Amino acid sequence: MAAKETKELPPFEYPQGYHCIAGVDEVGRGPLVGDVVTAAVILDPNNPIEGLNDSKKLSEKKRLALLPEIQEKALAWAVGRCSPEEIDQLNILQATMVAMQRAVEGLAVKPDLVLIDGNRCPALPMDSQAVVKGDLRVAQISAASIIAKVVRDQEMEELDKQYPQFGFAQHKGYPTKAHFDAIEKHGVIEQHRKSFKPVKKALGIEE
């Protein structure tokens, strides 16, 4: 029992003095194809949402059920993204930061504090704080995680309809054996990230 307790994350203590807090998370840093997608969410403290958790720990059915509830009950939400071309120009870390900035800029309500999942924050015009494992500890980040995950998954399913031979609906563009095999057999498509090593290799681009 004691061993289990040591693994539990400490509860997040919200900084004092802020009235409007946004949570931000990203999905799609690892895939070889498509946009990196981020979301920013400001929840309504008077209208709580049950069952928020890190999107990766929820079933697809649960994520799809929570999405409209988050969109309806949140005070504001927005999606930001960077394209494969931008990822190739900037690198994936910088592109993720830009996508997060775009999500925050898209909020109809301006937060006075932004909580970011992970260990670094993009440059923002308001206070911000990085929260390690924030998608498990901060409701606003959990909600952002769900929106970003559903949006990106749906985009991969649409891409799968255009290019069924790649199996994007199954692996969502991540570097799986099935994806590598498809690249070897069919080459790369416009939406592939040309700066990622497996794609470079397929294109015959030397490091």
Curated annotation (Swiss-Prot):
Protein's cellular compartments: Cytoplasm
Binding site for a divalent metal cation: 25-26, 117
Highest taxon of the lineage: Bacteria
Top-level enzyme category: hydrolase
EC id: 3.1.26.4
Cofactor annotation: Mn(2+); Mg(2+)
Matches recorded under CDD domains: RNase_HII_bacteria_HII_like
Pfam short name (any one): RNase_HII
Key words of the record: Cytoplasm, Endonuclease, Hydrolase, Manganese, Metal-binding, Nuclease
Keyword Magnesium appears in the UniProt entry: no
GO cellular component: cytoplasm; ribonuclease H2 complex
Record field: catalytic activity: Endonucleolytic cleavage to 5'-phosphomonoester
Keyword S-adenosyl-L-methionine among record annotations: no
Chief location bin: cytoplasm
GO molecular function per UniProt: manganese ion binding; RNA binding; RNA-DNA hybrid ribonuclease activity
NCBIfam families: PRK00015.1-1, PRK00015.1-3, PRK00015.1-4
Function: Endonuclease that specifically degrades the RNA of RNA-DNA hybrids.
Name of the protein described by the UniProt record: Ribonuclease HII
Gene field: rnhB
